[in-house]
């Protein structure tokens, strides 16, 4: 099966998930991430703001706030590159491109990724860290330059 067909199949499976089972799985995945050494030891969490079919990240974001970590979420630029901006609350977000929640305030751009983790959306990945995302290549471009810890949520 080629990458395009696999992506379509996985999207259909995600959309067909029972809401209660998805919520249970999301909470388990969030809990596992929050228990990792990488999360506990980082100062900054770069994290996507989830939509309905992605692994929910709002619990991760709120936990990071509670754990006094800096939280940054992405903005998709016109060239499909990503820029991350610090937020202090989920209330600082509004719907942007692709109907994705993005920070309203663009004054606090992240320019130092030291001691950070990046929580990455994915449809699937292998044990070597190769992932299939949602097809625009935004994270692929960012991750090719990012030297911190990358954690895929699938």
Regions found by a protein language model. Give the residues of each.
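Charged helix-capping and loop-helix junction motifs
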Residues: 61, 133-138
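Surface-exposed, charge/polar-rich loops and edge strands
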Residues: 5, 12-15, 113-118, 127-131, ...
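Redox-cofactor binding/interface segments in oxidoreductases and associated redox assembly factors
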Residues: 47, 120-121
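A structured binding-face within diverse protein domains that lines the active/interaction site
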Residues: 101-103, 121-124
